[in-house]
Every structure is written in C-alpha cells, then in structure tokens.
C-alpha cells in the first residue's frame, strides 16, 4: 500500500506542492520549486528515509549571472527557489536517524554547481554533527537519472 501526502510550497506559480510518499515502511519527500519551507510542512517531512530536495542556487553565483535583475529577485524571494544555505539548514532540521539519502535537485546551471551545493550541505550537516557514513548525499545532474534503491531493493 502506498500513501501520498501533498504539502503546500511557496512559489510564484499557482498551487505549487511537494510530496511525501510512504510505501513499504519507507518515506520519501520530494520538494522543489519553493522559496521557503513553512513550519507545518517541516513537521510533515521529519525523519524521512529519502529526500529529493531543492538546492537551486548560490546567491553570489546567481548575482554574477547575466540574468535580468527582476529574474534574480524573483529567484531569491520567498516565492522563488531555495538557495544552498537555506536548503542545507532546512534539511539539517528535518533529517533523522532513519534518513539514508539526500538528493539535491533543481540545481541551477548558471547560478550554482553540483560541487557548491554538495559542499554547503556537507558542511552544514558536519557542523551540526549530523554527517554519518551511512547517509548518502547526491547532487543531481540537470539531465541525469538517479536511482534510489529502497531497503527492499538495495544491492
């Protein structure tokens, strides 16, 4: 049996939502396209096994792009996209001992790098004493495919 819960997000498109999917005793959280995470949403996404979570931009890198100012402002506001630091902070507040993998998603091609997103998350988890050898961190490729192998499919 599978259960899917929709969680409200903050984006400049109507009715933007994330998902909490539970099946086979495991929980996956999928959140992209949001400028911030409300506290009631944080409560719903605590201690998932897997997170696919937006880490859209590095603020300094974004500001150095050739994008128009209004686009940059749209991206960094509360109904835009999560920057690396905010994403890492939220993740450090919600992951738990059952968390096995974090996939960083929606990484901007112009305003971020996979290495930058990964480094910020790794540093934040380390600073809070949350980095573990059994916790996988994976910054997703823009057009790649990443397989999350659940506990029943682990090789």
Short names for language-model regions:
Residues 33, 107, 142:
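Cofactor-binding loop segments of dinucleotide-utilizing enzymes, especially the Rossmann-like FAD-
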Residues 8-10, 54, 141-143:
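Residues at the C-termini of beta-strands that transition into short coil/loop
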Residues 39-138:
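Cap/insert and terminal regions of metallo-dependent hydrolase folds
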Residues 11-13, 59, 144:
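Residue-level detector of flexible, active-site-proximal loop/helix-junction positions
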Residues 135-155:
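Short, basic/aromatic-enriched C-terminal tail that caps enzymatic domains
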Residues 1-50, 148-155:
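Core dinuclear metal-dependent hydrolase active-site scaffold
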């Amino acid at each position: 049996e599978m259960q899917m819960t929709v969680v409200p997000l903050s984006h400049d498109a109507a009715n933007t939502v994330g998902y909490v999917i539970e099946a086979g005793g495991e929980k996956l959280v999928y959140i992209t396209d949001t400028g911030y995470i409300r506290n009631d949403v944080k409560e719903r996404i605590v201690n998932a096994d897997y997170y696919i979570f937006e880490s859209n931009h590095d603020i300094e890198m974004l500001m150095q792009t050739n994008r128009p100012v209004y686009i940059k402002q749209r991206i960094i506001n509360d109904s835009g996209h999560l920057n690396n630091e905010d994403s890492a902070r939220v993740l450090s507040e919600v992951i738990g001992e059952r968390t096995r993998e974090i996939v960083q998603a929606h990484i901007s091609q112009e305003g971020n790098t996979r290495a930058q997103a990964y480094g910020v998350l790794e540093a934040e988890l380390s600073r809070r004493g949350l980095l573990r050898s059994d916790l996988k961190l994976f910054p997703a490729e823009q057009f790649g495919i990443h397989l999350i192998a659940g506990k029943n499919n682990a090789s």
